[in-house]
């Protein structure tokens, strides 16, 4: 989910204490709309991230978010895993390891738990990540473990201090850093590296995030070429990146991917959310087409994306100069 989504949801919750936020998140009364559950989640994330200033509340927030892993919503659980990884709070690592290893959870949730462990840079999770890399029955989980292991090893090497990295416009902790600035690449070179299936996935992701940070329409088109890749994980990350970039140049390719009935749900759901984040006029009727999609995670993503679309466009009207 894009940082625009997060900003929206953080701004739209009335003042609640942690227990009230938990009750909304887990839908204790059975009446909480999905969008409000996301709002509660991102407010709990804020508390969990403040583990140095308020460790007690941070630990509670992690625990309360973890209660959601018993929910039926694949979309919500996957978002909880993502959020836990973004908190930088290592107290979340045991919960994420348990979720990653739980074969009763949906693969999309387990993949997100593995990615979150990479985002945390948790060395204590390397053993379990290696185990999943070798033995997990789902390709997307194995590929995510490969990335998470590479990211943790990169983070704990001297590379972060030696490499010159572009200051990111985005607040997210990504599955891989962008390619270092020491070497100059033109767009064609980055596109070629992005699509080279012989190269390590971590390196291809680094090319992806370098293209994201370039941010031009030409970079969008180069990224869109990755939608032809066989890896659902890879394609879902491109859709996520498009949601961050907010470029209308991505709308045609996202629309095409969302419409692929044979495509993996994790890819289609991310395409829907990206269209909501971009919030262009032509995205609205597209998203409405999927409000009754037969795939739960796609249908729920369309609901959340429309909530975001309406927010972005109402703000645009409200703040438009006279």
From Swiss-Prot:
HEAT-like PBS-type repeats lie at residues 109-135, 203-229, 234-260, 267-293. One of its GO terms (biological process) is microtubule cytoskeleton organization. It comes from the Eukaryota. Its main location: cytoplasm. Binds 2 Fe(2+) ions per subunit. It is an enzyme of class 1 (oxidoreductase). It is found in: Cytoplasm; Nucleus. Coiled coil: none annotated. The keyword Nucleus applies. One of its GO terms (cellular component) is nucleus. Fe cation 1 binds at residues 78-79, 111-112. It catalyses: [eIF5A protein]-deoxyhypusine + AH2 + O2 = [eIF5A protein]-hypusine + A + H2O. Its EC number is 1.14.99.29. GO terms for molecular function: deoxyhypusine monooxygenase activity; metal ion binding. Fe cation 2 binds at residues 236-237, 269-270. The keyword Transit peptide does not apply. Pathway: Protein modification; eIF5A hypusination. Belongs to the deoxyhypusine hydroxylase family. Catalyzes the hydroxylation of the N(6)-(4-aminobutyl)-L-lysine intermediate to form hypusine, an essential post-translational modification only found in mature eIF-5A factor. This is Deoxyhypusine hydroxylase. It comes from Candida glabrata (strain ATCC 2001 / BCRC 20586 / JCM 3761 / NBRC 0622 / NRRL Y-65 / CBS 138).
